[in-house]
Design a protein with these regions (language model features):
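His/acidic metal-ligating clusters that form di-metal
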Residues: 27-41, 112-188
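Alpha-helical scaffolding within the catalytic cores
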Residues: 24-27, 54-58, 79-94, 116-126, ...
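N-terminal active-site segment of His-dependent metallophosphoesterases
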Residues: 1-56
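Metal-dependent catalytic neighborhoods of phosphoester/phosphodiester hydrolases
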Residues: 16, 43-63, 78-89, 148-153, ...
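Beta-strand-turn-beta hairpins that frame and shape the catalytic cleft
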Residues: 1-4, 95-105, 127-137, 182-188, ...
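Binuclear metal-dependent phosphoesterase catalytic core
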Residues: 179, 183-237
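Surface-exposed cleft-lining segments at the edges of enzyme active sites
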Residues: 12-14, 47, 103-114, 144-147
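Active-site glycine-centered loops adjacent to acidic/histidine catalytic or metal-binding residues
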Residues: 8, 45-46, 74-75, 141, ...
Length: 237
């Protein structure tokens, strides 16, 4: 299995070339699909920039992708739960399975754009639902540890992850200037920089995750304009 995590496109942000940013990402992902294969793309929050009416335009823009995609809500996605559900067909807290692996999407904001901890009670229920899976990968826009300027402390959540053996990794967006791996206990937390917005890493890129048949997996950050592999991490499920 091979998937891509990209975040913080900020569609509609004033004084940014947001349309080109999205055109570029779509081109890069479609090229990856042709060259190496991509099972799905995950947009890890801040799909749009504050104005909820932008969501339709964003959805229309990414219809040019040649791969399936999933989304999480970021603090700039100031959209009501009903609009989110009707747009994407699932709520802001959602999980899905593909083969022997499960993927959990946790909401870390609200319609006001506040920073909130994921719903730990809901997470426990979803984790239990997928307890027999070989591995679980978690997507949260805002990192649940105060190890970045824009992170928030959610100790109940990180302890839950740490004590769940089949959780393999957590993916975070939000901090545009972070593209590395941070370790809490034994769990890796991956950041993917940004592909839009007006601040952050000097390049716009995304993160790739590859799960192999022998149950090993790796994740690395990718700069598609220069093609170096950055911050590679290898694990076993």
């Amino acid at each position: 299995m091979r998937f891509i995590v990209a975040s913080d496109g900020h569609y509609g942000q004033p004084d940014t070339d947001f349309k080109q940013f999205h055109t570029d990402l779509i081109s890069w992902v479609n090229r990856e699909k042709m060259q190496k294969g991509v099972d799905f793309l995950f947009f890890n929050g801040d799909l749009i920039h504050d104005d909820p009416t932008l969501l339709y335009d964003f959805k229309n823009t990414i219809s040019n992708l040649s791969v399936p995609f999933y989304v999480s809500r970021g603090n700039h996605d100031k959209v009501g739960l009903d609009v989110w559900q009707s747009t994407w067909g699932y709520p802001t807290n959602h999980s899905f399975a593909k083969g022997e692996y499960a993927f959990i999407i946790g909401d870390t904001s609200n319609e006001k754009g506040e920073y909130v901890c994921p719903d730990a009670t809901w997470l426990k229920t979803e984790i239990a639902k997928h307890k027999d899976k070989k591995g679980i990968f978690v997507f949260l826009h805002i990192t649940p540890a105060k190890w970045t300027v824009n992170g928030i402390e959610c100790k109940e959540v990180i302890d839950l992850f740490e004590n769940t053996p089949n959780i393999k990794a957590i993916f975070n967006g939000h901090d545009h200037d972070q593209d590395s791996t941070k370790i809490y206990g034994k769990k890796p937390y991956f950041f993917d920089g940004h592909f839009g917005g007006n601040w952050g890493t000097t390049y716009k890129g995304y993160r790739i995750v590859e799960i192999y048949e022998d149950s090993t997996w790796q994740s690395y950050q990718y700069n598609p304009t220069a093609a170096p592999v950055l911050n590679s991490f290898t694990g076993k499920s």
